[in-house]
Structures are given as structure tokens and as C-alpha cells.
Amino acid sequence: RKRNKIYALSDGASSYELTPNSPLPLLIQQNTEAGIFIGDDVNADEPQEVILFIRTNKKDSFSVSINGSALQQINADYPRLYDKLTGIKEPQHVTAFIVPANVVIQGNNKIVFSASANELILQRVELALKYGSVEECGYF
């Protein structure tokens, strides 16, 4: 409980002879859906901050909602601060959305993406639950 965590949708790559059950990579069109399971009881232990990291094949605009709530606030510094740019190759891009803590639920969370751009591909999804400082609550 109250440990910093990251929940992720795999990019679909196989490792250790295991093939993940993931919808990624996923072409983002109008109302493209992906689900992410959150094991934490976020109602009992509300995180200080929830951050949704989205990696796409290129930099382009798109919209995203979680459980029906549209996400508006982006923090351009977070991909670097949370070390999400390591291994990223041009023209890939990582966007960090701030998620209201009351939007996320324990269990399956529905994420809906929409983009008008052609061939915008969702490559990775990570949802970070920040409960406190690294010293108090551990690394992500």
C-alpha cells in the first residue's frame, strides 16, 4: 500500500518467450479504445498525483479520456523527469497527461483515444500512481 507504482500496457513485444495480451501497437482513429487494469484501491488510498504517459510513433495531436473524463492538462517536463525518453527514437513522442485521481478506479479503466492525423500509432501506455516522494514511497 501507498507505494509509487506504474501500470503499463505492453508495446506487444515478446520477451522471455512470452507474448503479452495487449492491443498495442494500435492505430489511433476516432474513439479507439484500450483498457488498463489498476490493482490499487485508489478510493481507499488516494494518490497525490496520477500521470498517464502515452508513447506514439510520431508527434501529433490527439485527445484522450479515461472512464469518460477528458484529459486536458499536459505536463511537457514529465517525460524527461520520469525518464520516459530513454530509448525513444525519432520521430516517436511521449506525452504526459495529468489525470484527476478521482477518475481512476480499481479494476479495468477504459481509455479512449481520438486523432484526426493519419497513421498515428499508439505504442505504449503507462499510468503512474504517485503516493509520495521516492524516499517515502519508493521508485516507480
Q: How would you describe each model-predicted region?
A:
Residues 1-140:
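Beta-strand-rich recognition domains
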